[in-house]
């Protein structure tokens, strides 16, 4: 049986109720005759808010470091796909080329950046929005947003974008390049990726996903530091504006050339409370909203719960933009355009499953019985 994505170490829990107060979907409660919080895997959407709000570190997430170590030890060719958020996470490493070499030293034979897959995803969104025929969409780049819809707004599943997240698209590209049996590990700031990949199969499914927190643990375990490695660049294909993906608005740089608030057909919404409110408005009054929604439960992927460092949003955004400028300034556009044409046609159907977890309101009889207790 799969370990729950988030769970409580009961001996550490002090019942401070911080997790219960902050859970956006009320997936945490205290069971009768217990003295600790309990997370319902069925109701949980994997946002990680409880993990970051627990003052005593009683809440943990499913670790996959041993799984990745096993993949690396048992296979000669293992591909690492790095989320573009590395630009704001690994600022303690002097040069990204050192970071790439550290991954190779860990045992990865190929090291790719997901920015190119984001470029592909952005082009798909651009086509989706330009072919607009009166139907509005919710982007599906954030797996926690997808689970929020699947579990608490299942009527909106048809409005979820038919385009999967960059992790899935990047995996499909890697399998196209290296073959269907290639081992793929996704490295990023999102804990929910660990559950997201379980929805997919075949060439669309990564073999594992680890967070930046776990990657740092692997570096420490093998005593890998930048001082021990030489420079090494990412393997091709290289991305363009996909490097801006860690910022919530980043993907719109490519898929929505219209920057005007008056005419742009897409509205970006980030953070759990605003996302919940936006989805409710989308569901109840879409004719007033007249917008597609670009949704992220965090303040951009650069602020994901799987990040190990505590840089604030503004510094992370600055690091991301600076990195993107450097990468774009040296991009071979002729090669990039050829690779976009080569891989843009890969079929990557999104997978969604309705899983209604809404609690029914008690009837008058039940309320009366409760009040009598």
Can you name each region flagged by the protein language model?
Residues 2-10, 14-40, 45, 49-65, ...:
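Iron-sulfur cluster-binding cysteine motifs and their immediate structural context
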Residues 62-373:
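Iron-sulfur-associated redox domains of electron-transfer enzymes in respiratory
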């Amino acid at each position: 049986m799969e370990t729950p994505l988030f769970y409580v170490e009961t001996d550490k829990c002090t019942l401070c109720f911080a997790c219960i107060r902050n859970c956006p979907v009320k997936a945490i409660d205290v069971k009768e005759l217990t003295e600790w919080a309990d997370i319902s895997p069925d109701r949980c959407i994997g946002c990680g808010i409880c993990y970051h709000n627990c003052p005593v570190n009683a809440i943990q997430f499913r670790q996959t470091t041993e799984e990745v170590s096993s993949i690396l030890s048992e296979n000669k060719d293992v591909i690492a796909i790095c989320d573009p958020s590395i630009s704001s996470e690994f600022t303690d490493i002097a040069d990204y080329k050192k970071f790439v070499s550290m991954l190779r030293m860990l045992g990865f034979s190929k090291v790719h950046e997901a920015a190119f897959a984001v470029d592909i995803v952005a082009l798909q969104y651009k086509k989706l929005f330009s072919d607009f025929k009166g139907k509005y969409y919710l982007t599906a780049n954030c797996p926690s947003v997808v689970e929020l819809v699947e579990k608490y707004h299942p009527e909106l599943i048809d409005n979820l974008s038919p385009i999967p997240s960059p992790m899935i698209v990047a995996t499909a590209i890697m399998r196209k390049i290296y073959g269907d049996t290639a081992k793929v590990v996704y490295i990023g700031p999102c804990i929910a990726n660990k559950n997201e990949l379980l929805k997919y199969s075949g060439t669309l499914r990564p073999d594992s996903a680890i967070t930046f927190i776990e990657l740092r643990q692997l570096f420490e375990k093998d005593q890998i530091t930048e001082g021990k490695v030489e420079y090494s660049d990412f393997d091709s294909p290289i991305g363009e504006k996909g490097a801006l993906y860690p910022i919530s608005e980043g993907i719109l740089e490519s898929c929505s050339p219209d920057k005007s608030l008056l005419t742009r057909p897409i509205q970006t919404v980030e953070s759990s409370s605003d996302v919940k409110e936006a989805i409710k408005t989308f569901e109840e009054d879409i004719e007033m909203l007249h917008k597609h929604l670009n949704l992220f439960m965090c303040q951009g992927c650069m602020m994901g719960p799987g990040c190990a460092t505590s840089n604030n949003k503004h510094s992370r955004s600055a690091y991301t933009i600076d990195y993107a400028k450097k990468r774009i300034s040296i991009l071979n556009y002729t090669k990039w355009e050829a690779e976009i044409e080569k891989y843009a046609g890969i079929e990557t159907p999104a997978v969604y499953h309705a899983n209604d977890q809404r609690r029914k309101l008690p009837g008058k009889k039940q309320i009366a019985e409760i009040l009598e207790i």
